[in-house]
Amino acid sequence: MMSRYEELRKELPAQPKVWLITGVAGFIGSNLLETLLKLDQKVVGLDNFATGHQRNLDEVRSLVSEKQWSNFKFIQGDIRNLDDCNNACAGVDYVLHQAALGSVPRSINDPITSNATNIDGFLNMLIAARDAKVQSFTYAASSSTYGDHPGLPKVEDTIGKPLSPYAVTKYVNELYADVFSRCYGFSTIGLRYFNVFGRRQDPNGAYAAVIPKWTSSMIQGDDVYINGDGETSRDFCYIENTVQANLLAATAGLDARNQVYNIAVGGRTSLNQLFFALRDGLAENGVSYHREPVYRDFREGDVRHSLADISKAAKLLGYAPKYDVSAGVALAMPWYIMFLK
């Protein structure tokens, strides 16, 4: 029996829609772009290249046909500018709002810019999408919203206090989305991402995520630093699972809308386990790394453990993650080796 996602992938090429991806030059945005263009959809992309890269768009172009690429319209603009948002939303059926300044440490160092992008920018996008009468608005929420609540697995309706300015911004997004559905009858779905990883996730810069950062260090023969004792755990989610969730959410029925969903695999991996998984993944691709990890202080604003209950997304969206951590690492490694060597 076909999964809901497999059915959707069959349906979409027969009835192309217009999709807007904000943050299209970023990690998740460029993977959404690749999938939608390969499904013969029309895509508008908005990005200001604050954290996204032209090279991600160039890579997508190399992976699709010229005809598919001609279905893509890129707008260089900023979600903090309402005119840019209005321009991007014109004639769009589905919005996939990924643009944001990620990273807990970045938000601690510069809460004002995080607020301007993640809250003011989000509100601009809601207004523009509402006024353009789009069919649905799917946005990147975050597992950071669970804050200091100790319960595992994380269930959507039980959250704690935020532990960082970033977590505050992502929670405010959920509140605004909920209010827009109540006040304006506007359909939104929030996807609480848990530690997404995969191809095109940037290994460079001060705020690189753990998997690309460690992989880069290993390939270059540098030390790998673990904050804390290494028993901190996360629910790592390969990018293809996240793409699946976005497409299912955008096209979901009315009963599934105006809610938030955990998007993960529902499995916990400690940082120590992750270290060995990455080392093994590199070894399978002919890259050896013989150093042991270097442990240092636990990082401010980080939660100790994270594990998602994904039953709500499974039930209401038909979400069925296909890739666990080891499968995701196996798929991502050749890309990292090519990119970093």
Swiss-Prot record:
Keyword S-adenosyl-L-methionine recorded: no
Active site (UniProt): 166
Record-level GO BP terms: cell wall organization; lipopolysaccharide biosynthetic process
Binding site for NAD(+): 27-28, 47, 50-52, 78-79, 98, 117, 166, 170, 196
Reactions mediated catalytically: UDP-2-acetamido-2-deoxy-alpha-D-glucuronate = UDP-2-acetamido-2-deoxy-alpha-D-galacturonate; UDP-N-acetyl-alpha-D-glucosamine = UDP-N-acetyl-alpha-D-galactosamine
Cofactor(s), by name: NAD(+)
Keywords from the UniProt entry: Cell wall biogenesis/degradation, Isomerase, Lipopolysaccharide biosynthesis, NAD, Nucleotide-binding
Effect the entry attributes to changing residue 306 to Y: Loss of activity
Effect of residue 209 to N: Enhances the specificity for acetylated substrates, and this is accompanied by a decrease in catalytic efficiency. Strongly impaired in its ability to use non-acetylated substrates
Molecular function via GO: isomerase activity; nucleotide binding
EC number: 5.1.3.45, 5.1.3.7
Pathway participation: Bacterial outer membrane biogenesis; LPS O-antigen biosynthesis
Functional pH dependence: Optimum pH is between 7 and 8.
PANTHER family in the record: DTDP-D-GLUCOSE 4,6-DEHYDRATASE-RELATED
Subunit structure, as described in the record: Homodimer.
Note in the entry: Whereas either WbpO or WbpP could initiate the two-step biosynthetic pathway of UDP-GalNAcA, the kinetic parameters of the two enzymes indicate that WbpO acts preferentially before WpbP.
Function statement: Epimerase required for the biosynthesis of the B-band O antigen of serotype O6 lipopolysaccharide. Catalyzes the reversible epimerization of UDP-N-acetylglucosaminuronic acid (UDP-GlcNAcA) to UDP-N-acetylgalactosaminuronic acid (UDP-GalNAcA). Also catalyzes the reversible epimerization of UDP-N-acetylglucosamine (UDP-GlcNAc) to UDP-N-acetylgalactosamine (UDP-GalNAc). Has very low epimerase activity with UDP-glucose (UDP-Glc) and UDP-galactose (UDP-Gal).
Record protein name field: UDP-N-acetyl-alpha-D-glucosaminouronate 4-epimerase
Organism listed in the record: Pseudomonas aeruginosa
Gene that encodes it: wbpP
